């Protein structure tokens, strides 16, 4: 390879490396801070589908930054804890497990709180996209295995208002 071509290729690699450091380095994805955002908390009631009410202590993810961070870097979770993602409208929702250290159950709910679909025991660190089977407004993430342990079935629905 001619010297000039090697130089251009080396320059390209250097620029690519610099971009990688700036975009995905310690400050996070394209400049977003890796610091965990503050989350409001609430009590969530969930009818598991047979009239039995379950209660969870949840962190509320309501902003794009909170949606992006979610439960990343959480090392342990109580059986009655979770995170409720609240979106502005209905859409097919897609989640992955990047930087998530524990298995999670993901429950997708429509704007009336009815269970649309669920993913059980999503593997930590997986980059596989987990999508709702239909439009959803809410996504509840619980400790992996909670759906089975708590008997949450296809007729499950959220109880509103939150914290009530």
Question: Where on the chain are the PLM-derived regions?
Answer:
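N-terminal secretory signal peptides that target proteins for export/translocation
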Residues: 1-6
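Compact, glycine-rich, soluble single-domain proteins
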Residues: 28-164
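Bacterial N-terminal signal peptides
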Residues: 11-25
């Amino acid at each position: 390879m001619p010297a000039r071509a090697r130089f251009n290729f080396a320059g390209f690699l250097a620029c690519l490396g610099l971009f990688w450091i700036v975009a995905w380095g310690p400050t996070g994805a394209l400049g977003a801070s890796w610091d965990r955002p503050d989350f409001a908390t609430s009590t969530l009631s969930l009818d598991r589908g047979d009239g039995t009410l379950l209660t969870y202590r949840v962190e509320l993810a309501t902003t794009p930054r909170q949606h992006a961070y979610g439960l990343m870097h959480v090392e342990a979770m109580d059986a009655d804890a979770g995170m409720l993602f609240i979106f502005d409208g209905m859409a097919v929702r897609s989640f992955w497990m990047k930087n998530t250290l524990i298995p999670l159950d993901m429950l997708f709910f429509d704007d009336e709180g009815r269970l649309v679909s669920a993913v059980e025991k999503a593997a930590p660190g997986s980059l596989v996209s987990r999508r709702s089977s239909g439009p959803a407004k809410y996504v509840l993430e619980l400790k992996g295995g909670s759906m089975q342990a708590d008997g949450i079935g296809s007729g499950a629905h959220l109880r509103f208002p939150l914290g009530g």
